[in-house]
């Protein structure tokens, strides 16, 4: 009985602590089964910025297009494969990479956007709408509750899991020059194991991040929307993953 009471008090204290220290307008933490452990404003529809790129990557992978195909249009003065564009979209959150993935989707850009919304419906993300592949438009919206479904779906794609754990995208552009783009989640590459990681920011959305991470308490999925800025979102998400 005493242990149960202590557990209840600890959980209540944790909830109050999180509410007092977070700048995020909506958030939640879920366990390995998707059971929500704690959250706030989970059903509030909000702009999700570059979290959108997870959906872009998924529909491109669903299409069955060759990952080794070189895309005709250049990025960083180089023709890149579809796989590298996916890496750039997830790791660097590169808008041009995400745009190109959609532009070269079967049927073109509009078919890509349609596929993103159809995928959302298939995942029962009933409060989510996608209007562009990058997240630059504030009309890409979802809820913390819907994004749990997105993260769990993304975790079943090996390439997304791989990219989520890359601290940077690197390649040689000449014998003497390398190019490197760091992961927008600064936790990656510092001893943490991620199944999914994606950040986002536009003024309308605020600082955003979704991540599925292996913690001392087990697998935790964190969705955080509307944080004050790009500097607050990651510490807040890290705190939530450790708190619950």
Each language-model region and where it sits:
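Enrichment for repetitive, rod-forming helical segments
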Residues: 10-11, 60, 240
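Sec-dependent N-terminal signal peptides
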Residues: 4-13
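Penicillin-recognizing serine hydrolase domain
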Residues: 19-26, 30, 107-244
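Active-site-adjacent loops and short helices of periplasmic peptidoglycan-processing enzymes
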Residues: 17-145, 149-158
């Amino acid at each position: 009985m005493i242990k149960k009471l202590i557990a209840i008090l600890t959980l209540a204290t944790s909830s109050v602590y999180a509410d007092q220290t977070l700048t995020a307008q909506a958030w939640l933490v879920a366990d390995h089964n998707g059971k929500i452990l704690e959250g706030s404003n989970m059903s509030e529809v909000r702009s999700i910025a570059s979290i959108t790129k997870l959906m872009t990557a998924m529909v491109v992978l669903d299409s069955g297009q060759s990952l080794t195909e070189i895309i005709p249009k250049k990025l960083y003065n180089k023709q890149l494969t579809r796989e590298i564009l996916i890496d750039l979209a997830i790791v660097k959150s590169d808008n041009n990479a995400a745009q190109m993935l959609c532009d070269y989707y079967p049927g073109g850009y509009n078919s890509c956007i349609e596929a993103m919304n159809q995928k959302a419906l298939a995942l029962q993300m009933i409060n989510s709408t996608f209007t562009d592949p990058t997240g630059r438009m504030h009309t890409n919206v979802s809820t913390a509750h819907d994004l749990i479904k997105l993260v769990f779906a993304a975790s079943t794609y090996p390439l997304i899991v791989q990219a989520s754990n890359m601290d940077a995208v690197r390649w040689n552009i000449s014998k003497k020059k390398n190019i490197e783009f760091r992961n927008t989640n600064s936790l990656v590459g510092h001893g943490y194991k991620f199944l999914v990681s994606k950040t986002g920011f536009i003024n309308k959305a605020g600082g955003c991040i979704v991540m599925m991470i292996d913690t001392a308490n087990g697998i935790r999925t964190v969705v955080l929307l509307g944080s004050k800025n790009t500097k607050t979102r990651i510490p807040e998400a890290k705190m939530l993953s450790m708190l619950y």
